Amino acid sequence: MITPITLAALLQRFFTLMQQRQASPHTISSYRDSFRQFLKFVQQRLRKPPSRLTFEEIDAPLIVAFLDDLEKHQGASVRSRNLRLTAIHSFFRFAAFEAPSHSAQIQRVLAIPSKRFTRTLVQFLTRPEVDALLAAPDQLTWSGRRDHAFLLVAVQTGLRLSEMTGLKREDLIVGAGAHLRVVGKGRKERCTPLAQSTLAVLKAWLREPQRGDDDVLFPSAKGERLSVHGVQYLLTKHRMAACKVCPSLKEKRVTVHRLRHTMAMDLLQAGVDRSVIALWLGHESVDTTQIYLEATLAMKERALAKTLPPNGRPGRYQPGDQLLGFLNSL
């Protein structure tokens, strides 16, 4: 009699292999969250704890039911649905080598297609909305000063959420050519220059008593790295406060990615070339040599000089369809 393959054993080997192959922490956490969500659904559907599930029970109809539940009952977007399916497909490609006797089951799962979706126009904040958001935190409190610095850096640099929460104090380089050193997707290192106003706020923030031992630039109240939920909480909190002086924010959801788009639009409005914007946002390969990093930093500093600081007066610019398509691809 063939002993059934447990799902737990396969999943553990799958994530161990990801770590051994040095997959990015972002990919690992995304796949982890996908399977957490999936296993909660399976537990409710099959009424079995995840540790007792066999691989054979995870078939295509069950996965399709999970994907449908994401959209119909959990309010997930098509992109989120496809992201969860990507994680499941990756696991089943691994299982094809670990459990070849289940090849028919595996092929049926791998045949589940991603959904097509209509790309919407890029959403970003206007200058008055940005100014209202930056003014919202109460800077008489520790958390307010942290949030103000966090928002200012996000707006001025266009860093990704994982890049913002992963910043260390040592990543802030002050003095001549002040910049943030960032390791983005694919472990590509890049340098993002800082405006003088942003640098002044960060210098003041560094003088605050450090919380925790992890040297995180923007820690939680417990001194730990901010969670995704924690970041969205502070963004929503300050958006609601900013609505009092800028009512248009009531109709917008503020996320770190939307602030990233806002920075990209600021650069476009300043006439910065799209190739430089892509380089700024980490969408171009960055050589790890110091010479290339310094050259990249100088190019970005010239781009930064063309933008306006918060409270500045923007110019008028109407991007063409190709530019909007470029922004949508970020």
Regions found by a protein language model. Name each.
Residues 1-330:
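Conserved catalytic core of the tyrosine transesterase superfamily
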